[in-house]
Amino acid sequence: MNSIIKRYKVERKDIAYLRYTIESYDGAAVVVTEDPAIAIIRLMISPLCENIVDELISSFVQDESLNIQEI
């Protein structure tokens, strides 16, 4: 199975928090910082976990008011 790749523009201060939280969902996704200077992250998502990761990203935006934009 191939990973689903999604890229996001986030706030730099949130990168570590996002990585820690997303990767705590064992096997759901791996977070890579593509460009720390402009805070671009790449998620490599397990196809079976895409809905979980999408819901998690939505929760970050709605419940925690994080600025996350898919690019």
PLM feature spans:
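Absolute protein N-terminus
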Residues: 1-2, 71
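Short hinge/gating elements
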Residues: 3-7
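Amphipathic, hydrophobic secondary-structure cores in small proteins
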Residues: 8-53
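C-terminal structural segments of small proteins and small subunits
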Residues: 42-71
